[in-house]
Amino acid sequence: MAHHAAQGDYVACVVLTHGARVHDKVISDSMFHRERVPTGDELLEMMTQRSDVKAEEVRKACGILGFQDVYFFGEDDAVLLMTDDNVRRLAAMIRLRKPDIVLTHFPREGDAFSNPHAIAGQITMYAISYAASVDPADANPPHRVAQVFFFGTGAAATRHQLWDAEGGYYNDVFIDITDVIERKLAAMDCLVSQGYGGAYARKRIETSDGAFGQAGGVSYGEGFISLYAETHYLLPVTDYALKRARSSDHEIMAGYSYRIKAD
């Protein structure tokens, strides 16, 4: 996203849930070991406050990556389900903003039916499909998305549970983020309430972005799974592939050996 924002592309983010129940330092962490937790309006008020904190952290993180438009749908993350309402709402956003590319979670991540990432991906896929047609409640014309990329972290990560046995998915696109890795770290450091800053951010960047980078022949990368096959007039070969083909073993290793300074 930082690369696209830097070259002048319009970049925006949609956050489906308020996120107050998951990973939050106050709601899901400090209350975990209590004998009793607040209920009713008291808990709802706390969750509203915490979701506001999270939203501000997300805005700050996105600003570091170079874009400002962040849309919060505020869905309750207690039991995230695909509904007619959230599909129509997201489809309306797609018709309004007319994206060429959509990034989203893999619709079959984890068990694919209780995993909130998977449900978010399913909502997105239905919305993309519906956005290509008219809606009596939406004056914007239909819009067709050109390409969808699923986050590789969840869909093509290390298998470690029963549902991963389905597998078979692999990252077919790697994006070199070495030049903006410090900015990604700074963005993750903003997500304090989520527990993503500090030591976790540095570990995550090395183990995830570092692994994707090495697979792609660079120091740090992000992996994606593309939805549609690409059509070309000529057989494609990237500049990265040509450079690797003309590099010695040690030059290839040097290409992915840079390590961010951890403070």
Model-derived regions: residue spans:
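Metal-dependent de-N-acetylase/amidase catalytic core
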Residues: H3, D76, L80-D263
